[in-house]
Each structure stands twice: as C-alpha cells, then as structure tokens.
C-alpha cells in the first residue's frame, strides 16, 4: 500500500498542465521516451509503439485521462518506446474508432483507452486489428454489448466500493455527521463508489455510537460541471452538509465551487485531488497509472500479446492488488489515523472485512445506524 501511495504522489507532482491543441481528425501528440517523458507536438504518421486514445476530456484533466496517460508515459520511458496520445474530435463511436485507426497506421502495438464510452469502439476495433493489443480501463465486459473481449483485449475494472467504503468510514470517524454523495451518471463504477461510501459511513457511525449521521445522495445525470450542479450543492452546503464525495469527473468542479462559497469540504475521486482543490480532505483513488504499467508490461514480456492473466477477460482490481485506497499522506484527518487505515486495509485484503459490491441503482445498501436521503 505504501508503494502505491508513493507512486500516486510522485505522479501527481510530475504532471504538467500543458494543453494539447488541434482540431483535425488525426490529432496526435508524440512522446519519445528513450530518456525522457516530455511530450512534443507531432502529426499523425510519427512512430508510435503505445497509443492512448482519450475520452471526451484531455490529458490535463487532473483525473482519469491524465493519470492513464502518465501510466503509458512511465511504461514507455522505462522501456525506450514511443508513446502518442490521440484525442477524438467529438463524443462518438466513429470519432473514437477514427483515432484508433490513426494509432494503428502510426504503428501502435498496443492501444490504451479509459472509460465505458469506449465499449462499442473496442468491440469493433479488437476484431478489425487482431494483432493490436487493446487495454481498456473502466470498461466492463457488459460495455461491449453482444461482443465478448477477444484474446487481444484486456479489460480492467476496479473495486470502487472498497475505496468508497474507506472514504465514508474515515469521514464519519473523523467527526463529520452531515455528508453528501454527488454522482455523475448512475453507471456501475459511480454506483459502487457511492454504495461503498454509504456502507463505510454506516459502519463508522455504528462503531462510535453516532446516531445522528445523515447522507444526502444524488446523481446529477451527467459528468459536466454545470450551474445546476453548483446550485444543488450550494443548497446542500447552506443546509448544513459538511463534506460531499463528488464522484464524476468535471462535476467535482461545481461541487468545489459550492464548497468554497459555503465553507464546505469535498472528497475527491479516482486520483488524489488535494493538489487541485483546497477543499479536498481525502480522495478515493484507483491505481490507474500502476495498472496500465503492469498490463502493458505483461503484453511486452509475452511478445506483445496479453498472457492469460489479462487476455480476453475483465480483471477486477482492488485492495488486494494495491489498486484502490486513500492517499493518507495528503489527507486532512484529525482523528482517523494511519494505523487505523492500515488495519482496515489489511482486513479488506484478507477478506475479514467484506463490502457489498452490488451496483443496481434500484437496490440501495442496507444501513443500521445512519439516515440516507436519496434525491432525484
């Protein structure tokens, strides 16, 4: 766990916020990584060993895209390979496939993508390019529709409920009694985060005998930062909500704006967001860069074909693989300690602490001590 947290911190400190411009369908940025991982602008046609195709965001989003790209860069830097990233010109399957085509034309041995929106594109591209290895983070087998992952595809999902549980438990143990969960869309990863958060908060409340813990729970219906979300969060904070777990990419920007305006706090998601938002007390994180590096290393060591560890299957990573957690070194807890965290983490790893991983939006987690207000 300490290795994972150190990795997250190092990656966070190393990332720059240089934007990638360009609006052509073949936009690509190259990183020659024999000795450095500094990106330099390039046109499609440059040599590519490993490609990263972004989702609707960019590589400076301080979230999923940025840390996934960091994983690609780290891997290529360590192995004297060339990395390119490709940004679709619009949010469509056709645009995503077009950038995959560009990556293959540039010589990519492997293409990395992140997010469930890539399901249809992966389902088509894996058959179109059987010699290219596709690594898809946060894409489940179900996201591929009626297609199954082929031997050249590795799907990685995460046990978000474990990270959410740790965040909920720590917040309540630390003394917060009025909590909120702001989800983007009610997709499996977001639901698991939220349900884990509820379970953790309930467990802590029961342990410390707090019968007055409340959670407001709401899905905004999208991942964009909007005035609607900010207004909703303004209402929560002004009504007494102390901290909100904001789970849904850019939607956290609206939550942070409301938190700042009302003196509230926020829990970040996916990556350590303490450097991005002063309101963040902790973050429920995934080991994005680390899992990218491990999967690509697996393919490279097997002649650029995934081994049976990843090939044609969905691999779920959690505490046992050091791929979810809280960045305790940057967390702003006053009561919840590193020792408590380590003990709880070990209990999750060895199975002593079991956390419900269901993600049915219509079936809420059972609670014994807290009150949850599910809002629509």
Locate the predicted segments by residue.
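Universal eukaryotic N-terminal targeting presequences
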Residues: 1, 25-28
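C-terminal motif of bacterial Sec signal peptides marking the signal peptidase cleavage site
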Residues: 16-19
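Bacterial signal peptide processing site
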Residues: 21-23
